[in-house]
Design a protein with these regions (language model features):
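Gly/Pro-rich active-site loop or hairpin
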Residues: 29-39, 100-105, 141, 180-181, ...
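N-terminal pre-domain/capping segments
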Residues: 8-122, 155, 196, 280-288
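Active-site-proximal loop/turn and secondary-structure-junction residues that shape catalytic pockets
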Residues: 27-29, 61-63, 89-90, 134-136, ...
Length: 288
């Protein structure tokens, strides 16, 4: 009778993908009323988000020097939080800078500002986000020229972010905010034309609800490119407060092995505390 060899190897284990929760805090007074949950400073945001069980904060700061490094690191340590990402939109909101502006000096200033924000985020291992600073085409600038300027910028800024071992997030926006790239698929195809592989897409569910025919299918098609999620509802309020069906979206994220943040870039409606509470309740229900 042949000798039977017994294997001591354990059966393969199913990988348990774990999402992480994050919430936005704006320090930019000029953006007051915009889609950010917390507005009363980092101390307030850290205390309240940690108490609710969030894993991280996403910071929208007016500039790289607006935050005291030792203070923020102390708050993060005290409350068991990290920084999920940092926005660069203050470059547009405060200065009107765009990466696709017709003037070369203007574009250089825009890139320098983004680099400074990459440096700021790098202190906390947090990627920076290119959203509104991508600009638009029109006037003397054709769409092809604007996309060439954007490609030039991302090919410079992506490798710059790599020194901190983080990607740079590029966010397709809806038609009312940009006329460049508006869908995940357009973002993926654009990324394929870059010389850097350090650009990941930020998929914002609010923008996607306007531009995508099928949000879950768009996310699946973005496998390997989607690096960050803005987790909101159809009306840009907290998840659960609009008419979006989040279950297929969460399943799609699981299908592409997404293990990043679901971050609430939502209006503080009816107020910050309620928006935060609604968000974490929806997050826990959907990711249980």
């Amino acid at each position: 009778m042949p000798h039977r060899i017994h294997s001591h190897q354990s059966p393969p284990q199913e990988i348990n993908m774990t999402f992480k929760s994050a919430i936005t805090v704006s320090l930019v007074e000029e953006a007051r009323g915009g889609p950010f949950v917390y507005w009363e400073g980092l101390k307030d945001a850290c205390e309240k988000s940690a108490a609710l069980g969030f894993d991280a904060i996403e910071i929208f700061a007016p500039g790289p020097d607006a935050v005291d490094e030792s203070e923020l690191k102390g708050l993060l340590q005290e409350h068991g939080l990290v920084v999920a990402a940092v926005g660069t939109g203050a470059g547009m909101v405060k200065h009107g800078w765009s990466l696709t502006h017709a003037d070369a000096d203007h574009r250089a200033k825009a890139r320098d500002f983004v680099k400074q924000m990459i440096d700021f985020g790098g202190k906390y291992n947090a990627p920076a986000i290119i959203g509104s600073m991508q600009g638009k085409w029109g006037g003397d600038i054709s769409r092809d020229q604007a996309l060439a300027f954007l490609r030039e910028a991302l090919d410079e800024l992506g490798p710059y972010a790599a020194q901190y071992n983080v990607p740079l997030f590029y966010e397709p926006l809806n038609r009312y905010e940009t006329n460049l790239l508006r869908t995940v698929d357009e973002g993926v195809e654009f990324c394929k034309t870059l010389s850097t592989d350090n650009i990941k897409l930020l998929a914002d569910l609010f923008h996607m609800n306007i531009e995508e025919a099928d949000l879950a299918a768009a996310i699946r098609a973005g496998k390997g490119y989607v690096g960050h999620i803005h987790f909101v509802d159809s009306n840009r309020q907290a998840a659960g407060m609009g008419h979006m069906n989040h279950e297929p979206i969460i399943q799609a994220l699981k299908d592409i092995d997404y293990d990043g943040y679901l971050c609430a870039e939502a209006f503080a409606l009816p107020d910050s505390d309620t928006a935060a509470k609604n968000t974490i309740e929806a997050y826990k229900r959907l990711t249980a």
